[in-house]
Amino acid sequence: MKHKVGILGGTFDPPHLAHLQMAEVAKQQLNLEKVLFLPNKIPPHKHISGMASNDARVEMLRLMIEGIDYFEVDLRELKRAGKSYTYDTMRDMISEQPNTDFYFIIGGDMVEYLPKWYHIEDLVKMVTFVGVHRPHYQAEVPYDVVNIDMPETTISSTEIRNNIEHAEAFLPEKVWLYIKEHQLYGKK
């Protein structure tokens, strides 16, 4: 029997409660054994200023999932030299774990960008894409995407960074304390 592993990639700058909720909902609805949080370098489609360091983002992710044994952090994209594409990551993971079905979890707002992903025609044969519905985003693409529903949330890392003084309710406590202690995003 094949293993079922979810992958939630992102900049996680910072990781927040909606990230946890997406991973939990996908794990439950798809009966996944575990979910890997895959922090990435700034992806080709994003340009973020004021970004936390890789080390800070990784530490916040580890704090967020601490004590949840079916969540793990995978650092391969941060360690890869040069550009890091999902295609390369999945090719490596499948080679390392051939007896595993991978479910790549993306926010509903990212589904419409799938046609622009590097080697998407090959990638859709390698993984099952899972679109987590968020408010006001519905996209149709010519690829099979498993859609799962998540309770409505409007949390985004961008909004948290831009309004850090009022963001405590959207962050796991340990992440909030880390942000305060390290004065990230202007938090003194």
Swiss-Prot record:
Keywords of this entry: ATP-binding, NAD, Nucleotide-binding, Nucleotidyltransferase, Pyridine nucleotide biosynthesis, Transferase
Pfam families, sorted: CTP_transf_like
UniProt xrefs under CDD domains: NMNAT
Biological process according to GO: NAD biosynthetic process
MF terms (GO), sorted A to Z: ATP binding; nicotinate-nucleotide adenylyltransferase activity
Catalytic activity: nicotinate beta-D-ribonucleotide + ATP + H(+) = deamido-NAD(+) + diphosphate
Pathway: Cofactor biosynthesis; NAD(+) biosynthesis; deamido-NAD(+) from nicotinate D-ribonucleotide: step 1/1
Record carries keyword NAD: yes
EC number: 2.7.7.18
Coiled-coil stretches noted in the UniProt entry, renumbered to this chain: none
Record-stated family: Belongs to the NadD family.
Function: Catalyzes the reversible adenylation of nicotinate mononucleotide (NaMN) to nicotinic acid adenine dinucleotide (NaAD).
PANTHER family linked to this entry: NICOTINATE-NUCLEOTIDE ADENYLYLTRANSFERASE-RELATED, PHOSPHOPANTETHEINE ADENYLYLTRANSFERASE
Entry-linked HAMAP family: NaMN_adenylyltr
NCBIfam families: cyt_tran_rel, nicotinate (nicotinamide) nucleotide adenylyltransferase, PRK00071.1-3, PRK00071.1-4
Name of the molecule in the record: Probable nicotinate-nucleotide adenylyltransferase
Biological source species: Listeria welshimeri serovar 6b (strain ATCC 35897 / DSM 20650 / CCUG 15529 / CIP 8149 / NCTC 11857 / SLCC 5334 / V8)
